Amino acid sequence: MLGGFPQTSRIDLQGSSNFLTKLRRGKAQTTRESLPPLERVADCGAGIGRITKGLLLGVANKVDVVEPVKKFTDELVQSLGNGEYAGDGEGNRGKGQVGNVINLGLQDWIPEAGAYDIIWNQWCVGHLTDAQLVVYLQRCKDGLKKTTEGQETSKSCIVVKENLSTDPKHKDLYDDEDSSVTRSDVNFRRLFQEAGLKIVATELQKGMPKELFPVRIYALRSA
């Protein structure tokens, strides 16, 4: 998904970090004080852990990874530093740890109810049909922590960050080689609505090479 451009991963992770910080601070909060760590998040379609290691371990105490390919998660776990994998039984001095390693496809994963501050989905939902995506998002919605009244920065959400179709008529683009779909912004919004979700923040990723599809990030909560 990074298109062979080595600088793209850094640009992507920085954009995601900035988006998440703005989302957690909320419109009314301009303080530069550091935010408390999130308790538990999920990295879905985690692969070898680029987002887990490059972003989520820095903002959360526990990161569960959901990835169907076991050799990818084995590589992820082997690449972690001392104390970064809860399965080793070591603490990590207040820093984030990888918690559960779940080798399932998104369509088969049922999140623990009310467990997660953030469920992060990036470059993975294109392998789900529209119907599967709606059901999956509904399950993710049930997996979010319930918000405590008045705790604006602790509001949980689903994050979806994906390539967008560039079709002038907003049609989805299908790739027969890997059986994936690149959806239009219009279709994403329709599917989010079908799943009972509202968009609370969204922006285009800046700085990506023009040769690649545009990338948009959405933060979603129950409508």
Describe the residue ranges of each PLM region.
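Class I (Rossmann-like) S-adenosyl-L-methionine-dependent methyltransferase catalytic domain
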Residues: 1-114, 128-141, 148-223
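A conserved beta-strand element that flanks and buttresses the S-adenosyl-L-methionine
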Residues: 120
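Hydrophobic adenine-recognition pocket in adenosine-nucleotide-binding enzymes
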Residues: 124
